[in-house]
UniProtKB/Swiss-Prot annotation:
Pfam families to which the protein is assigned, alphabetical: OsmC (PF02566)
Stored InterPro entries: KH_dom-like_a/b (IPR015946), OsmC/Ohr_fam (IPR003718), OsmC/Ohrsf (IPR036102)
Protein name: Uncharacterized protein Rv2923c
GO cellular component: plasma membrane
Parts of the chain that traverse the membrane: none
Domain of life: Bacteria
Organism of provenance: Mycobacterium tuberculosis (strain ATCC 25618 / H37Rv)
């Protein structure tokens, strides 16, 4: 299984890493060139929805179909959580009939509901444990 971690690079700035060599810059909203943790959460959801629906869409629209999944959601700063996250999947469906479009919407929603682990986790909630380890001893 891929290992994930973040390393502190400055005040409220981190770099996220994986054992597969991926990196992402994380920081405060006032820092250019970084994602906030909340933005990464929303991007993970959008990417998961796109990936979960990729094969059904490719079968119906062709392997080279274009898709953009936009995602948004304001934080409730009193509760420090996102009470609502909204996604919009933009596709060119002009080559489909109205019936085909309706069927495709059902297929997309079913694929995302069944295969998007991020969305399923957000909708059901999860347990998070934090352990603090003294590495200086």
């Amino acid at each position: 299984m891929t290992q994930l971690w973040v390393e502190r690079t400055g005040t409220r700035r981190y770099i996220g890493r994986s054992t597969r060599g991926a990196q992402v810059l994380v920081g405060s909203e006032d820092v250019d060139g970084v994602f906030t943790p909340g933005e990464l959460l929303k991007i993970a959801l959008a990417a998961c929805s796109g990936m979960a629906s990729d094969q059904p869409l490719a079968r119906r629209l062709g392997d080279d179909y274009q898709a953009v999944v936009k995602v948004s959601g304001a934080a409730d700063r009193d509760q420090e959580r996102y009470p609502l996250i909204e996604e919009t999947m933009e596709l060119d469906l002009s080559g489909l009939t109205e019936d085909e479009k309706e069927r495709l919407l059902v297929v997309i929603n079913r694929a995302v509901e069944l295969a998007c682990t991020v969305g399923r986790t957000l909708k059901s909630g999860t347990t998070v444990n934090l352990e603090v380890v003294d590495v200086g001893a």
